[in-house]
Amino acid sequence: MNTEASQDQTVPETTGVRLRQAREALGLTQQMVAERLCLKVSTIRDIEEDKAQANLASTFHRGYIRSYAKLVHLPEDELLPMLAKQAPIRAAKVAPMQSFSLGKKHKKRDGWLMSFTWLIVLVVLGLTGAWWWQNHQAQQAEIVTMADQSSAQLSQNGGQSVPLSDDNSDPANPVDTQAPVANSQPSTPTENGTVPATSSAAPADTANNGVNTTAPQGTTSAESAVVSPSQAPLPSVSTAQPPLPTADAGVTGTASSADSLVMNFTADCWLQVVDASGKTLFSGIQKGGATLNLSGKAPYKLTIGAPGALTITYQGNPVDLSKFIKANRVARLTVGVE
């Protein structure tokens, strides 16, 4: 019997038995140890029964045992030999190769994703460029069409304005013809020997009047023919006629200044302006730096090829063209609508 008892005492104690004995010596329960170590009661029970959880790594298991030993004041050196036998450190599986292969797959997938993204970006850029080019070509074609139409209208208007230019030149003809008549007046008295040739136009008229009054009744028809042409244009040179067109021009300028349309060009621009009566005031291309002042019957219909190339002022107020400039398109607007 004594031999059997001594054999039982010589049986080596395990880590779980040593921890349980130390816990009982301090009067602690498994619940109290679990609360202090922030572990489950089942984990404390498995440690005391020398059971290792299958889903728990050996590193964590050894860490729990060390924390338990510190709590019950057991030296760590005493438990390490037993712990090495009961819970040997298991070699980790070859995880780096798996992670490398996963990383390679991720990189391959990221490469395809980036290629697809760049393809979409290039397609969007290409479509945007094509859309802009089509709009640009359409605007250029529209401007060329409007320029052709305006040139045709100008040619028609030019053919109709030929009689007007002839009428305007007719009043100027008497003025041109009066000058030689006035120059011829001094020569007439010279032939008669009454007034010297160096006299002015006014003394020449006086001399001619004197010749007519002092001439005898038997004056020949040739002399009267020479004197009468010099006297015939005299009423046309009267000072009462020039103020009449001047007054009319002043009234016209005052009436048209109220509806004046001023355009300052910063670059070359095609422009067409039509007033309320349907008259084309201007149609063509203006150079940069030019100023165009138009007057007609309001409202005005404007067609501008490049809205950003000019500024418009109507009745002293600027006309807003910002929406056409932002849209980068031909501007069609009406100015002077009440």
Swiss-Prot record:
The keyword Transmembrane applies. Gene3D superfamilies: lambda repressor-like DNA-binding domains. The chain crosses the membrane at residues 112-132. The keyword Kinase does not apply. It is a single-pass type II membrane protein. Keywords: Cell inner membrane, Cell membrane, Cell shape, DNA-binding, Membrane, Signal-anchor, Transmembrane, Transmembrane helix. Residues 1-111 are cytoplasmic. This is Cytoskeleton protein RodZ. InterPro entries: Bact_Cytoskel_RodZ (IPR050400), Cro/C1-type_HTH (IPR001387), Lambda_DNA-bd_dom_sf (IPR010982), RodZ (IPR023690), RodZ-like_C (IPR025194). Residues 133-338 are periplasmic. One of its GO terms (cellular component) is plasma membrane. Residues 196-209 have a biased composition (Low complexity). Residues 151-163, 180-195, 210-241 have a biased composition (Polar residues). Pfam families: HTH_25, RodZ_C. PROSITE patterns: HTH_CROC1. Belongs to the RodZ family. SUPFAM superfamilies: lambda repressor-like DNA-binding domains (SSF47413). It is found in: Cell inner membrane.
